[in-house]
Amino acid sequence: MKTFSAKPHEVKREWFVIDAQDKVLGRVAAEVASRLRGKHKPEYTPHVDTGDYIIVINADKLRVTGAKFEDKKYFRHSGFPGGIYERTFREMQEQFPGRALEQAVKGMLPKGPLGYAMIKKLKVYAGAEHAHAAQQPKVLELK
């Protein structure tokens, strides 16, 4: 018997919606990253994007454990000398709700063209409403 290798045109993708209200950031990100890669499917192939589409709602109500709400820092750099900027998790959630989750998931995905294609299948919304009702997403409950 030959080893099965998924073909990109044969992959069946589903849509899932996750409610992130009162869920821990890292636990949600780990599950989302795994589903975006397709590791939950028996036909998972590392070099093929076999993952599903994931919609995350209520990303503004994510929580972190310990003192990370004030202590966790996000850095970016303008490219100029001294051009480093930092934001705490609290500031990030106030100004750009959902970006902390996007960055956490992006860090868990492979780097390169395959990872860039996977992150495009993640849709994050701050509130309870999303624009993907036509895709009939299934509700995915996290522990």
Curated annotation (Swiss-Prot):
Superkingdom of source: Bacteria
Keywords: Ribonucleoprotein, Ribosomal protein
Disulfide pairings: none
Keyword Ribosomal protein annotated: yes
One MF annotation (Gene Ontology) recorded for this entry: structural constituent of ribosome
Protein function: This protein is one of the early assembly proteins of the 50S ribosomal subunit, although it is not seen to bind rRNA by itself. It is important during the early stages of 50S assembly.
Quaternary state and interactors: Part of the 50S ribosomal subunit.
Family statement drawn from the similarity comment of this UniProt entry: Belongs to the universal ribosomal protein uL13 family.
Name of the protein described by the UniProt record: Large ribosomal subunit protein uL13
Organism: Neisseria meningitidis serogroup B (strain ATCC BAA-335 / MC58)
